[in-house]
Amino acid sequence: MLGRVLKSAARSQRGLRSFATTTNLGPFTEISTLSNGLTVATESQPHAQTATVGVWIDAGSRAETDKTNGTAHFLEHMAFKGTGRRSQHALELEVENIGAHLNAYTSREQTVYYAKSFSKDVPVAVDIISDILQNSKLESGAIERERDVILREQQEVDKQLEEVVFDHLHAVAFQGQPLGRTILGPKNNILSIQRDDLASYIQTNYTADRMVLVGTGGVDHQSLVKLAEKHFSSLPVSANPLALGRLSSERKPTFVGSEARIRDDELPTAHVAIAVEGVGWSSPDYFPMMVMQSIFGNWDRSLGASSLLSSRLSHIISSNSLANSFMSFSTSYSDTGLWGIYLVSENLMNLDDTLHFTLKEWTRMSIAPTEGEVERAKSQLKAGLLLSLDGTTAVAEDIGRQIVTSGKRMTPAQIENAVDAVSVDDIKRVAQKYLWDKDFALAAFGNIDGLKDYGRIRNDMSSMLY
């Protein structure tokens, strides 16, 4: 009897399979544009109980001058100090009452204000964000109090040697240009920025055509569009509006091969970053450069079995105790970038060897990258990119950043296909184009007396393998 039941069940399953269809249940990004140019983008998950909504603005420290450097970051601090409708206390209380998290950050090319809340409270979150963006009081007393807060933040940043090195790397790579400035700005600017500077930055940069309102998780696209029309329709438009992702007539930054060395023999380690000019977000070489960066990857001597990792550079450095750690990077901006490596070492007498073998591996990419390491790098890159899209806030970050920088959003499947399309020949091509015999920017901090001069390091950028 039991056998007949099992056979009947099997026949039933076979019947079901013959009628099965494949359905793409994955979320997709809906994009609309208001009459004033503000973009609304959503990736809805109807059954989600929480949502992230935020505004991504195509303006950061790059939109400042030498005199106003630090204004965008200062504004980020002032956003939570009260508006015409809400005092600081009322704003904080309203956010707490709905159990939301309100946050903001500034980068060199973007400013972001976002909130994570329950789905039912999305209208309140959008109202709060629109209020702080358009109606912040910018009171003189609050500005004066915030100076001390930002100066303390600057002191904390100065203690993070990686941050210090990368700020110097930008400063030498893009000398005298907006991308070379720090995000917080110099101390003198922090002490001198006035309300008029903040108001002028808002008027110039907080315009509808430079903003993307993003919603992810438990949000409905049409509902968010209506909220955008209600709260953002009065936003002005730039004097010379451009579609998001379109480069302005501003001249592309000039990459300068140069260096900055800050020697401090009291430190037990040397911190060195070296980079060539990279590519912008929309460059056709973006994904090949990302794969090449993934070939080198990251390494730390605390990792177990580090000498057995697939990266040849990891094996060389770990086997010879040349460094404590290294981190490869491919940093992109709208029209340029930095591609390189950041090393930390207490083997101070062998800094020359550390850089020599690193650049030797860079050189090898122009001549003989292997199929195996390229395929491994592609798998690692895909895993890293796709696994980073975990949670509504991470997805909102991805959507906002992509639309602001390129005017569109690549789906995870499209990203996967773009990475898969990278070949060994592509790696050779981009290595020859961006690495071989190119000038580099170098920033070094700490106990760096053993670091050889720029000219000798430069020779390794085109040395033969043998």
UniProtKB/Swiss-Prot annotation:
Keyword vocabulary terms for this entry: Hydrolase, Metal-binding, Metalloprotease, Mitochondrion, Protease, Transit peptide, Zinc
Regulation: Binding to mppA is required for catalytic activity.
Single Gene Ontology BP annotation: protein processing involved in protein targeting to mitochondrion
A molecular function (GO) term: metal ion binding
Enzyme class, first EC level, given as a word: hydrolase
Active site residues per record: 76 (proton acceptor)
Taxonomic superkingdom: Eukaryota
Subcellular location: Mitochondrion matrix
GO cellular component labels: mitochondrial matrix
Entry's family note: Belongs to the peptidase M16 family.
Purpose of the protein: Catalytic subunit of the essential mitochondrial processing protease (MPP), which cleaves the mitochondrial sequence off newly imported precursors proteins. Preferentially, cleaves after an arginine at position P2.
Subunit relationships: Heterodimer of mppA (alpha) and mppB (beta) subunits, forming the mitochondrial processing protease (MPP) in which mppA is involved in substrate recognition and binding and mppB is the catalytic subunit.
Name recorded for this polypeptide: Mitochondrial-processing peptidase subunit beta
Gene name of the record: mppB
